[in-house]
């Protein structure tokens, strides 16, 4: 059976889980070849990149110049020289964003954004009339720390878990990390590290009795055999819901009540090097990456935004988050309003004070550190051969 798949941006590079300091440079270094070479060598050392080639150096120069010029403009967002500075945007997109949701929708006979496009069809928040001007579920202790998916294309699992963790915290008052690895290993309707969708992940949780805490079923960054012995102290949900497509107001109603999983297209020079602020730049509307929306608001200049949690670790963007402009187009900027869904949890299960409910293990190991240097070198070697 043909299914849509989000084959995720899988950050198998150095920033995934280990913190990397920001890369700084002086404007005068951009004035000479020697200055650029010094920057390039310093950047390679910071990111543990052994390869030193004229082609990569030329791309590095091109990207640094574009980043520098962009940051001199009056834009509501800033860019930074990150670990992708020696990759062209085409290489970046082809390497980390090679899935086209619209392609799979066409095979199924669906139009883009056709998920529940009838605004009132089963949408539980359709009749909500009053919602706050600003919501940030991080401030309400409903969002866990930013995680890292590593070299596994499991963004769909991380996005689904953002929504599951959020609704559990809202209903029970307990913030618990849940297991992306269980979804990667056990949800056979999705493709593990080769991509997937959030809606089938929610359906798996419903049909298979729940999702375990991360402490019981920790993340390893690859698909393994489903280990049912680790599935205990589970969170159960009562259903799932799609947000009407091409409708940011419907999406805002949903996010006002709980974190939501969605798909976006992360492409374009700006997103490759995004650092901070409200992103208003170029990107497409063919979602290829799963993320969680954990809030919305408006900045001091009146630009409306979505607060989006990514799964590339805390050193990308704004400590692992990106603010995407809200209200830019019917699909939402980067297609954020085209493919959104959330779990339904009517009552705490177990009840709030049940000692047998899901809980974090304070002694559980943190996310594993992925060995990335060899993989990084392999990517660059392959790009040079193209």
UniProtKB/Swiss-Prot annotation:
Organism, as annotated: Ambrosia artemisiifolia (Common ragweed)
Gene Ontology annotations of biological process type: proteolysis
InterPro entries, A to Z: Papain-like_cys_pep_sf, Pept_asp_AS, Pept_cys_AS, Peptidase_C1A, Peptidase_C1A_C, Peptidase_C1A_papain-like, Prot_inhib_I29
EC primary class: hydrolase
Tissue-level expression: Expressed in pollen (at protein and mRNA level).
Entry's pH dependence statement: Optimum pH is between 8 and 9.
Native organism taxonomy: Eukaryota, Viridiplantae, Streptophyta, Embryophyta, Tracheophyta
Catalytic-site annotation from UniProt: 155, 289, 310
Family membership: Belongs to the peptidase C1 family.
Region of interest called Disordered, as start-end residue ranges on this chain: 340-377
Activity control, per UniProt: Activated by L-cysteine. Inhibited by cysteine protease inhibitor E64 (L-trans-epoxysuccinyl-leucylamide-(4-guanido)-butane). Inhibited by cysteine/serine protease inhibitor leupeptin. Not inhibited by serine protease inhibitors 4-(2-aminoethyl)benzenesulfonyl fluoride hydrochloride (AEBSF) and phenylmethanesulfonyl fluoride (PMSF), metallo protease inhibitor bestatin or aspartic protease inhibitor pepstatin A.
Name of the featured protein: Cysteine protease Amb a 11.0101
UniProt modification remark: Autocatalytic proteolytic cleavage of N-terminal activation peptide. N-glycosylated. Glycosylation is not required for binding to IgE.
Proregion positions: 23-108, 371-386
GO molecular function: cysteine-type endopeptidase activity; protein homodimerization activity
Keywords: Allergen, Autocatalytic cleavage, Disulfide bond, Glycoprotein, Hydrolase, Protease, Signal, Thiol protease, Zymogen
Signal peptide location: 1-22
